[in-house]
Amino acid sequence: MNDLLTIGDKTFRSRLFTGTGKFPNASVMQKALIESGSELSTMALKRVEVNNPEDNILKPIVDAGINLLPNTSGAKNAREAIFAAQLAREALGTNWLKLEIHPDPKYLMPDPIETLTAAEELVKQGFIVLPYCHADPVLCKRLEEVGCAAVMPLGAPIGSNKGIVSRDFLEIIIDQARVPVVVDAGIGAPSHAALAMELGADAVLVNTAIAAARNPIAMATAFKLAVQSGRLAYENGLASVNTQAVASSPLTAFLD
């Protein structure tokens, strides 16, 4: 498919973005990321030795030719997130950033106020900001207005594998957005990813469902195909939903 996605200064063929946590080892992670076809992978700055080119998270991604998307997971407020972003840009040479601010370690819900504050400042500092946020149409619009390159509303809580529980709100966000919408968090099965794409999301980000699978490499293939299938379905028009039966072969003038 010649269906490209542009975010900021990069263009992607794959609409499956990936995470790097929870894999059994670096080798499996690299093979799964390559098999997924993903061209953008995120890693928590707190887990990476940014000054070590042999780091077992960073090196496999770089060697595979996948674009880096450092994230600020662990930041509890805007100040901490901005500081982490500046360190990442200096160490990794990228101004791309997945902005994550979740002060509650139990539920990892993103803080909307701190996220918006940090996003506005980081955009001013020249970052390409992709904020992880609630599936809140008003917040997503505000993040777009302050200059975020995309928005990343959650499908369900991080790591829950519950799927697209925020569907109604995601549909509004997708309808209103003038920047790409990347559904992030909660996607636990290829069918969830396909549904997000069928709704019109521009991309999805998947981590736990691939990394924690019995065979992460095979599961990466499943997600790759699901994202492609969902996007193809959206692009070509899904049949409308009806409240009553509609015959596929009407018996018009039968036996007249």
Curated annotation (Swiss-Prot):
Q: Which GO terms describe its cellular component?
A: cytoplasm
Q: What is its EC number?
A: 2.8.1.10
List the Gene3D superfamilies.
Aldolase class I (3.20.20.70)
Q: What is catalyzed by this enzyme?
A: [ThiS sulfur-carrier protein]-C-terminal-Gly-aminoethanethioate + 2-iminoacetate + 1-deoxy-D-xylulose 5-phosphate = [ThiS sulfur-carrier protein]-C-terminal Gly-Gly + 2-[(2R,5Z)-2-carboxy-4-methylthiazol-5(2H)-ylidene]ethyl phosphate + 2 H2O + H(+)
Protein name in the entry: Thiazole synthase
Extract the GO molecular function terms from the UniProt entry.
thiazole synthase activity
Listed under GO biological process in this entry are: thiamine diphosphate biosynthetic process
Presence of keyword Cytoplasm: yes
Q: How does it assemble?
A: Homotetramer. Forms heterodimers with either ThiH or ThiS.
Instruction: Provide the species name.
Output: Aliivibrio fischeri (strain ATCC 700601 / ES114)
Give one Pfam family, short name only: ThiG
